Amino acid sequence: MAKNYYDITLALSGICQSARLVQQLAHQGHCDADALHVSLNSVIDMNPSSTLGVFGGSEANLRLGLETLLGVLNASSRQGLNAELTRYTLSLMVLERKLSSAKGALNTLGDRINGLQRQLDHFDLQSDTLMSAMAGIYVDVISPLGPRIQVTGSPAVLQSPQVQAKVRASLLAGIRAAVLWHQVGGGRLQLMFSRHRLTTQAKQILAYLTPEL
């Protein structure tokens, strides 16, 4: 059966978008707020109509992720910011595979996400309350699966509890995207053997987006 590289590329961009948000937060203490909203919302939407629906139904919502994906796919250097992004992306994929084989963790994750949906009736998605709740899910359910993702950045920035919560919430969104990636036929071998196909697809999607003014 032929793989749907459009859906695979969208889901992979979702992972990369989370990786980029983590990097922005760790180095600067802030990140692209619109992209963060899209990624966080993807965790809570349990019944999307399509792969694109997970990310709000618009390709533009994944602009940051698509651009990051191209950087990861075409990274010639194993050092610097692209190396960080590649490490975060691959680490999220590894953790997702561990999650998928841990039945108890999957059940707990589902229950905790249902709890988030109830909290959304009272708090904004990017409120400290929701951010802390998402971070708590990552710490309690995902981190114990190991290996832990080592986030690098500014030590002063990373000491902030608010930044720590946003980083962990972004990593949780990355796990969500990695689950989706496998559901639509994604696999790590594609990063080696289908690099050109993924690059072409990502460029095509970006080309259709309205240029930012």
UniProtKB/Swiss-Prot annotation:
What does the sequence similarity comment in the record state about its family?
Belongs to the HflD family.
* Compartment list: Cytoplasm; Cell inner membrane
Query: What name appears for this protein in its UniProt entry?
Result: High frequency lysogenization protein HflD homolog
Q: What is its main location?
A: cytoplasm
The UniProt entry's coiled-coil ranges are: 79-122
**UniProt cross-references to NCBIfam families, sorted A to Z:** PRK00218.1-1, PRK00218.1-2, PRK00218.1-4, PRK00218.1-5
Topology with respect to the bilayer: Peripheral membrane protein
